[in-house]
Structures are given as C-alpha cells and as structure tokens.
Amino acid sequence: PTDTLEIDLAARYESTLGQSSVEPKISALWTPAEGVFIRASAGSSFRLASENQSFGIGPSGTTIREIGGEVTQARALAVGNSNLLPEESDSWTVGVTWDVTDSLTLDLSYWEYEFTNLVTVVSPDDILLADQADGFITDPRIELFPGANNEICEITGRWDGVNLNTRPGDCMTGFDIALFKSGFINQNTVETNGVDFQVSYDFPFMGGDAGIRVNGAYVNRYAGTATDGSIIDVVGTDGSNVAGVGTNPQLRGNIIATYNRDNHSFRWTTRFTDGTELRNPRA
C-alpha cells in the first residue's frame, strides 16, 4: 500500500548492580508512493562498564615520548575503577529507500549519535604530558626507579636537549621510568554524524542472476572531549592515543559483485578505506 505511515514505540528497562535505566525508542516508516520508503528513528541506550574496566588490572607495555634524549618503553598497568558511570547514548536517524525499478534500488541514511560517560583508559602519554610542564615528574601514577632524579633538564633549562655529551648526569631520561599506573575514566562526550549509502542493481546474466552493490559510509564529524578538556575532531586522523578512540577514516566503501546459477555462486568484494593523517589532532 502507498501513502501509509507506521509508528512504533518501545522502551527497555534494565537494572544491574544497583543501577537502573529506562531507554525509550520511537521509529516511523512512511510510504508516500509505490517503491519509496522514508524512515526515521530516535532513541537512547546505556551500558555498564565491563568487569575488567571496573575491577581488573591489565599489564601492558608502552612506548613513551623522548625524555632526556631517549625514547624507550615502560611497563604500564591499567587499573579498574569501581566508580565508573554507565555509558549513555542518544541517537537519531533519517533515511530513504527508493526502488527505482525492479532491478535498481537506492538507499541513503543520515545518522547522528551523542555518547556521554564513555569509558576509556588514560594513556601513559597523556599522564606524562600533563605532569612534565614544570620540568619535574611528581604525578604518583608515574613510578621512577630507585635513585632516579625526577628533573627533565631540557624543560627546566639545565640542558639544551640536543647534545647528549653535555647532558648532566643527574638529569632524568626515559629509562628512569619504571611503571605507569593508569586507569579507566568516563570520558566526557563524543559526538558523531555521517551518511550511509547503497546502490543495488540486479540483472539476469548468462542464464543466472547477477548483482552489483556499491555501499559506504561518510563520517562528517567524530569529536570527543579529551582528558584535558579540549574538544578534538579525529575524523581523518590516527587519534587513538589522544581521544581514546581508534583510527577514523572519513570514507569507507565496498563494491560487491555476485553471480548465482544453479548450484554455483561467485562473489567479488573490493573494499576502500580513506587514508588517515598520522598526527595528533590537538596539534
């Protein structure tokens, strides 16, 4: 039928470990003409931190930035945080599907998500950056080897930071760091929006059925609040050590070709991922 409107309302109640939430959702589907479908939805959700994030201890190693002319590795512990708040999100989407012919279908969707209280681990690099501004390491989350000095002389000015032969012997180097004690925190907010698209074409070919699909996603914005309070848009960058998220290419896509005949089938997939800049998005 055409010129029809369907509306669905739903809600989910969840109670775990003394925390509860009611998450509503509304969705609508409008068919203004034959082969044309317009849809929209809005809702919210929440997720508790995992057992490891709340109570676990995860050992790892990390490569730290140059200190005293030395780039080195140090041990790191990510300690659980029992006071983590649940992650929450609000989202809405709107899209249209058009069956142009029996063979050709076009699909376009716009989506927008806002996440709050996202759980992420504080990176050792962020701990070090926040603590070294005055040239001395005093953060209790950074443990030095016994007898090591906590002065970074290239910051305090006792060394030019270039010629290793002139570096005072009591100046701190990267090898003096024994351990980072990082932990999980609720990152403030992440906002993201973008577009998904797909073109599908099916046709008979050599006694069988062939099809071509072109689909992809374009991320317009992926911005989050870092541990220092700054707003970072990491789209198109490798910002995993800054915003607590992975690499974020702006465009991803697939071209899929299929062919089916009797008991035989063929599928070919070509994937495209946009390049990313290996840079600090805060720079």
Residue ranges and their predicted role:
Residues 1, 28-31, 44, 98-100, ...:
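Residue-level signature of outer-membrane beta-barrel architecture
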Residues 1-29, 34-87, 89, 110-171, 265, 269-271:
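Surface-exposed extracellular loop regions of Gram-negative outer-membrane beta-barrel proteins
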Residues 4-7, 35-38, 102-106, 207-210, ...:
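Repeated loop/turn-to-beta-strand initiation elements of outer-membrane beta-barrel proteins
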Residues 9, 26, 40, 94-96, ...:
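Membrane-embedded beta-strand positions of outer-membrane beta-barrel proteins
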Residues 12-18, 47-49, 89, 115-117, ...:
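Sequence/structural signature of outer-membrane beta-barrel proteins
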Residues 48-109, 113-115, 180-195, 200-205, ...:
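Outer-membrane beta-barrel signature, preferentially recognizing the C-terminal barrel domain
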Residues 114, 120-280:
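Gram-negative outer-membrane beta-barrel transporters
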